[in-house]
Regions:
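Short, conserved helix/loop micro-motifs enriched in His/Cys and acidic residues
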Residues: 121-152
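Short, structural beta-strand-to-alpha-helix junction motif
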Residues: 155-162, 197
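"Short basic amphipathic alpha-helical interaction patches in structured regions
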Residues: 111-114, 140-144, 175-176
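Extended, aromatic/histidine-rich regions of cofactor-dependent oxidoreductases associated
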Residues: 2-96, 102-108, 117-119, 165-402
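Generic beta-strand or strand-like secondary-structure segments
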Residues: 98, 127, 159-163
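Acidic/polar N-terminal loop/beta-strand segments that form early-domain functional surfaces
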Residues: 99-103, 111, 129-131
Length: 402
């Protein structure tokens, strides 16, 4: 299929069918994932995923995906914010514009990015700030994601630094904003624009055109997206087409009112006493997840069960992953992979369990990082109105049968 015609196909095959059919029992698999069902209708370039919406596309990866350091492209979650996505993209004509407080306003074609700039790779976790939002009680606003609004990929592209150097920064340039091709239905609705400080730009921030050795999947931002390793995905702008450099921070809806948490020591509030002062969500918390087994898995008494999963943080580095089978009274170290994918990537882990007794068995995992941070128990996580940055100790419950 031509990439530029992708979404016409998607709207026909997935859009009209997914929402119209996945509400019926016949259109869902019997494959529960944390009490959620994977649709049996797949979007193009994707295997069946947990579907929340087709416009904009909101697709969650099933728990079973999280057993290796890299997430396959066709199982990678999808999160768009605005409902209108181009149905036609011609890669030969696509370009990204750089303007604002620069010495030279420029437009750089996709071809030029690929042929005239140094190509670099970075492996990094992409995670929605609202991942696992459904765990917050009372329920918060936003998509009620389960555990799978995240993935890890090897991204290839060009350094943001190099693109800005090509344009040349004007004196006093302080901020840089990013806008993509997703649009709202009404003109009054703000574009989804995110900003970062120029002083915080480092070599691992790239404009990516490849994901796991292939062109970006259409639903993951083809043909170009911003990659900001270590921070939540709200700023990883998809279908990136416009970069604006400014001397002052702009007034932007999606910076001023969205993806923000209480600006206090606990980053917390209560439904009856919302925080007056807030700050953007940025660096990811230390986190881990069991990919296998899953809740409801049946295993044979006397067998050896290998627990597998992943751990990550905002780039400080995972130090340990530990497993408990006694509700957290005691913990044992899992085996971590060699970490060769880099500090922003998943660390895959494994742990061998000998199943000596039949019955229900709960398995917990928690990660710690080199900064000294450790996952808390779910009951110790403080509430915030957006349901952001959840990183509670993970648990699955299996049945050991004689």
């Amino acid at each position: 299929m031509e990439r530029r015609d992708f979404f016409k196909k998607a709207l026909t095959v997935a859009g009209t069918a997914a929402v119209g059919s996945t509400t019926t029992e016949a259109a869902q698999t019997v494959h529960p994932v944390d009490n959620r069902k994977v649709s049996d209708i797949a979007f193009p370039q994707k295997r069946p995923l947990i579907t929340y919406s087709d416009r904009p596309p909101l697709l969650e990866s099933p728990r079973e995906v999280f057993t290796s350091a890299l997430t396959p492209n066709d199982l990678f979650f999808v999160r768009w914010h605005l409902p209108i996505i181009p149905t036609y993209i011609n890669p030969r004509k696509f370009s990204v514009k750089v303007d604002g407080a620069v010495k030279n306003e420029i437009k750089i074609s996709l071809h030029t990015l690929k042929t005239e700039f140094k190509a670099v790779e970075v492996t990094a976790v992409l995670q929605c700030g609202g991942n696992s939002r459904t765990a917050f009680k009372p329920t918060t606003s936003g998509i009620q994601w389960g555990v799978g609004a995240m993935g890890c990929a090897k991204w290839k592209g060009v350094r943001l630094k190099d693109v800005l150097q090509k344009a040349g920064l004007a004196d006093g340039a302080t901020w840089v904003g990013f806008n993509g091709e997703e649009k709202a239905v009404y003109n009054e609705t703000s574009d989804f624009i995110r900003e970062i400080k120029i002083a915080e730009i480092h070599d691992d921030i790239i404009l990516a055109y490849e994901m796991n050795g292939e062109d970006l999947p259409y639903l993951n931002g083809y043909p170009l997206r911003l990659v900001l390793p270590g921070v939540y995905s709200d700023s990883w702008i998809k279908m990136l087409s416009h970069i604006t450099v400014t001397k002052e921070r702009q007034k932007l809806h999606f910076m001023d009112h969205a993806y923000r948490i209480p600006d206090n020591d606990c980053e917390c509030e209560t439904p009856d006493n919302l925080a007056a002062k807030t700050k953007p969500i940025e660096e990811m918390n230390v986190n881990s997840l069991i990919g296998y087994p899953q809740t409801g898995t049946k295993v044979k008494q006397g067998a050896e069960l290998i627990v597998r999963g992943i751990a990550f943080d905002g780039g400080h580095g995972i130090k340990t992953v530990q497993i408990s089978i006694d509700s957290g009274a005691t913990w044992n170290d899992a085996k971590l992979d060699d970490g060769s994918q880099g500090k922003y990537a998943y660390r895959a882990f494994s742990y061998k369990l000998k199943l000596t007794e039949s019955g229900t068995l709960s398995i917990l995992c928690k990660a710690s990082n080199e900064k000294g941070e450790e996952q808390p128990f779910p009951q110790d996580i403080k509430w915030n109105h957006g349901g952001y940055k959840y990183n509670g100790i993970d648990k699955v419950t299996v049945e050991v049968v004689a």
